[in-house]
């Protein structure tokens, strides 16, 4: 759930 995924 990272901002880039």
From Swiss-Prot:
The modification Glutamic acid 1-amide is found at residue 5. This is Tryptophyllin-T2-2. It comes from Pithecopus azureus (Orange-legged monkey tree frog). Expressed by the skin glands. It comes from the Eukaryota. Disulfide bonds: none annotated. Belongs to the frog skin active peptide (FSAP) family. Tryptophillin subfamily. The keyword Secreted applies. Keywords: Amidation, Amphibian defense peptide, Secreted. One of its GO terms (cellular component) is extracellular region. The keyword Secreted applies. One of its GO terms (biological process) is defense response. It is found in: Secreted.
